[in-house]
Amino acid sequence: GETDVNAHNIEQIEAKCKGKTTIRFITMGDSQRWYDETEDFVKEVNKRDDIDFVIHGGDMSDFGLTKEFLWQRDIMNGLKVPYVVLIGNHDCLGTGAETYQAVFGPTNFSFIAGNVKFVCLNTNALEYDYSEPIPNFGFMEQELTDRADEFEKTVVSMHAHPFADVFNDNVAKPFQYYITQYPGLQFCTAAHNHGFDDRILFDDDVHYIVSDCMKSRSYLVFTITPEKYEYE
């Protein structure tokens, strides 16, 4: 089956959105166990012709089993539009992180759609010892300047937002400091909570917008225009 899924799809996203000043994308996540609902999601999205790409906010798997990732990948590959998948805390269980990296790629990555950079981060600190920095500030810092002339706005996506149970709250403030350094920060997206939420977690007007799980048959559609952003 296909490996390096994110890299292949990012090529398509970047090519498709090149030169656009308005982009429209979907966030969803936590599809673990809910295969039928995820198949229905794919059918729903395929009925639309206004979506540029989809961000899966993580937790494709329940137990980090290889077959779970492959089943979900095969379902998501049914989408007419390109998609990327973030790593969720359940995806880190057992050998899940290795499988995720083989099938989808690095756990921290970024891409540019139109004039918006999407910085996608592994925030599941609880599932790791200190062998790997979660969140990876070195990566976040590098993304501030990498391809700087190609984007004017930024969206930061993660599975678990600060103060969620698997986030390392010890670094919540430095994490937020790094995020607010990004040019034209629009908002942050997250999943994990199995419920919709839009909240400001710090004293700074940065919205964390959380998509519900697939069990609820729910997803969010974001539009970023030259003037503003909105979602439904």
PLM features: residue spans?
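Short, solvent-exposed loop/turn segments at secondary-structure junctions
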Residues: A164-V166
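Hydrophobic beta-strand anchors of alpha/beta hydrolase catalytic cores
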Residues: F25, V54, F118, T154-V155
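Extended active-site neighborhood of metal-dependent phosphoesterases/phosphodiesterases
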Residues: D4, N9, T66-K153, V171-F187, ...
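Short, histidine-centered active-site or binding-site loop motifs used for metal coordination
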Residues: G57-G58, N122-A125, A160
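Short active-site segment of divalent metal-dependent hydrolases/proteases
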Residues: R33, S61-D62, D91, P162, ...
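Active-site glycine-centered loops adjacent to acidic/histidine catalytic or metal-binding residues
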Residues: D30, G58-D59, G88-N89, H159, ...
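N-terminal active-site segment of His-dependent metallophosphoesterases
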Residues: G1-W71
